[in-house]
Amino acid sequence: MTDQQKSDILQGTLDLMVLKTLDAMGTMHGYGIARRIEQISAEALAVNQGTIYLCLIRLVQKKWISATWGVSENNRKAKFYAITKRGQKQLAEETENWERVAGVIGKVLELAPARSK
């Protein structure tokens, strides 16, 4: 898949995907989180490094994740992130909201008549 074919992440969904990734995978560094999201999406989503780090800063400020310094698998200093109890609660709320919105959008798409070409 080319870079042009990769989808931008829907606004407001990156927080949800980061929280879910940390909840499922445990403590990870920012690059690892971004790569995991890309892998799970079969490379359909491209996670910009600048975007992921702004997201991580925002989630730390909201106390949905915590950050600690450590050493990465390639022996480099890196900041590692973990979901907090508050983050787990937020993940549950955002997941419920996402499922509701996705269901509504699905209904609209099913009901909308197809246009002739």
Please identify what each model-predicted range represents.
Residues 60-77, 82:
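Beta-hairpin "wing" of winged helix-turn-helix
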